[in-house]
């Protein structure tokens, strides 16, 4: 077991609550000690919604530890059922309260005897899985529960819609640009003449889950959430699914061609080639931009990519294939699905990194000194310390990644957003130099280029002054070489003389 003060993917109960609070009229109850109950605050702060987060903490305190939880948990479930009238209540422990080894399944059965709505215990092993795996499993559990319930009641709708239709599975609260992606996917489906049957879990009613089998196919835009549900629906009803993330011009076209293949296999007669060509050449600016002089200035520049599987893989392909940028390494924190990631990106980058230790990722960035980083909020912090620009492409995210304006990452409008993000992330040619000349950023001190906080070197006033005379675009490199030179010779304070000596040593 390892103590972590930064996690890329949160604990399992966060994933369960993300799915529960994405549905309409579903209430989540977490059986948790104080400290594990931060989901409400986090969601209320980040998601730009007017409604309260439908999650209640059933707090594990000293009274519970003395008497057991049954009475309190059952009371909380029945009280919330009376107050909110939810269609479904999802109970989840946290990894901390799981230690108590209580029979929560029994509590749920007891509570459901006196509730109007359904009650479910999240079927998740809190020690074995993280937020993303738990979200996928909880969505699958809820889908299965309501499909089986409809089957039992005899009101399961299995007859296909007259026109081609789709279920979009995996759009959830607190996802990276998920709301905007969903809007863009709906537009894309409308352009292709495909009706959207259901979007789950975001904004969906659990009573509509019985309508899922009516769609012609399922679209899984994100690798992390929705796969288990898609496999279940395929097994039960023979429903095909498309799991190509339409991010970037090439992958969007590949996704549309796969949809065409799936529809034509079911008796439709569609041809989307003209649409793909029109969008690529005339509507999406990304294809034109990648041939422009602006983008050609980026050719061969070094970048690193890190994030969840979906976004890191898609971004690596866009940079390497569509923009000619040299991806030195691509990494993911989704260790549980690393085989897929390796297969997707290995031909587009020099090195594949599977690691969830933010310190190791920071050191890997410092080691290769890229021109730009594409990662999570943590890599943005690393970039600030290293004075390397960073574009955020994946969760974990902060309030600025929930923009008010329309910024999808998927579909053809998404290609424009990604192109902007890439171009704006690289420092423009004369920018640093002009800032130096006109005295911009004059409060900015040159900071260490190591991430691990073990630097034992100091710069004297004359050494710092001499360093500041060096143009910004090479200053970082000179500073690192000088510090390396000083460490090798056990020098603790770097003066102007040490800087000159280091320069000579490198020159020699």
Curated annotation (Swiss-Prot):
The active site is at 294 (proton donor). Binds 1 [4Fe-4S] cluster per heterodimer. The cluster is bound at the heterodimer interface by residues from both subunits. It is an enzyme of class 1 (oxidoreductase). This is Light-independent protochlorophyllide reductase subunit B. Component of the dark-operative protochlorophyllide reductase (DPOR) that uses Mg-ATP and reduced ferredoxin to reduce ring D of protochlorophyllide (Pchlide) to form chlorophyllide a (Chlide). This reaction is light-independent. The NB-protein (ChlN-ChlB) is the catalytic component of the complex. Protochlorophyllide reductase is composed of three subunits; ChlL, ChlN and ChlB. Forms a heterotetramer of two ChlB and two ChlN subunits. Substrate binds at residues 429-430. It comes from the Bacteria. Belongs to the ChlB/BchB/BchZ family. InterPro entries: ChlB/BchB/BchZ (IPR050152), LI-POR_suB-like_C (IPR013580), Nase/OxRdtase_comp1 (IPR000510), P-CP_red_C (IPR042298), Protochl_reductB (IPR005969), Protochlorophyllide_Rdtase (IPR016209). Its EC number is 1.3.7.7. HAMAP family: ChlB_BchB. [4Fe-4S] cluster binds at residue 36. The keyword Oxidoreductase applies. Its cofactor is [4Fe-4S] cluster.
């Amino acid at each position: 077991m390892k103590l972590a003060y930064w996690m890329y993917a949160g604990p399992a109960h966060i994933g369960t609550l993300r799915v529960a609070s994405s549905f309409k009229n579903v209430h989540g109850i977490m059986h948790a000690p104080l400290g594990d109950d931060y989901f409400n605050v986090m969601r209320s702060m980040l998601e730009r919604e007017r409604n309260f987060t439908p999650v209640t903490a059933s707090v594990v305190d000293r009274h519970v530890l003395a008497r057991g939880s049954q009475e309190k948990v059952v009371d909380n479930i029945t009280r919330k059922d009376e107050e909110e009238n939810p269609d479904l209540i999802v109970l989840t422990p946290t990894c901390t309260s799981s230690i108590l080894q209580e029979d929560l399944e029994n509590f749920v059965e007891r509570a459901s005897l006196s509730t109007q709505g359904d009650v479910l215990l999240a079927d998740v092993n809190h020690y074995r899985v993280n937020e993303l795996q738990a979200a996928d499993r909880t969505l699958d559990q809820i889908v299965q529960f309501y499909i089986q319930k409809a089957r039992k009641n005899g009101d399961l709708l299995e007859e296909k819609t007259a026109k081609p239709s789709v279920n979009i599975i995996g759009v959830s609260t607190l996802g990276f640009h998920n709301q905007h992606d969903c809007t863009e996917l709906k537009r894309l489906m409308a352009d292709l003449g495909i009706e959207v049957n259901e979007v789950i879990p975001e904004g969906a009613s659990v009573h509509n889950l019985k309508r899922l089998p009516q769609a012609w196919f399922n679209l899984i835009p994100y690798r992390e959430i929705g796969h288990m549900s898609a496999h279940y629906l395929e097994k039960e009803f023979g429903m095909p699914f498309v799991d190509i993330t339409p991010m970037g011009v090439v992958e969007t076209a590949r996704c549309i061609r796969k949809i065409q293949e799936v529809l034509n296999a079911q008796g439709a007669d569609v041809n989307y080639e003209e649409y793909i060509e029109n969008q690529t050449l005339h509507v999406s600016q990304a294809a034109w931009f990648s041939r422009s002089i602006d983008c050609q200035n980026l050719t061969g520049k070094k970048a690193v990519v890190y994030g969840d599987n979906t976004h890191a893989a898609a971004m690596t392909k866009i940079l390497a294939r569509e923009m000619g940028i040299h991806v030195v390494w691509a990494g993911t924190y989704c260790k549980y699905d690393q085989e897929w990631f390796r297969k997707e990106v290995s031909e587009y980058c020099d090195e594949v990194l599977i690691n969830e230790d933010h310190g190791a990722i920071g050191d890997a960035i410092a080691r290769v000194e890229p021109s730009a980083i594409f990662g999570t909020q943590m890599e943005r912090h690393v970039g600030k310390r290293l004075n390397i620009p960073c574009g955020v492409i994946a969760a974990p995210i902060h309030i600025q990644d929930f923009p008010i304006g329309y910024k999808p990452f998927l579909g053809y409008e998404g290609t424009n957003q990604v192109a902007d993000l890439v171009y704006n992330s690289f420092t423009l040619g004369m920018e640093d130099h002009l800032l130096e000349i006109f005295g911009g950023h004059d409060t900015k001190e040159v900071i260490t280029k190591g991430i691990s906080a073990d630097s034992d070197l100091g710069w004297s006033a004359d050494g710092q002054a001499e360093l500041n005379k060096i143009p910004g675009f090479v200053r970082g490199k000179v500073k690192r070489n000088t510090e390396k030179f000083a460490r090798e010779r056990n020098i603790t304070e770097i003066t102007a003389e040490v800087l000159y000596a280091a320069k000579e040593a490198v020159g020699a």
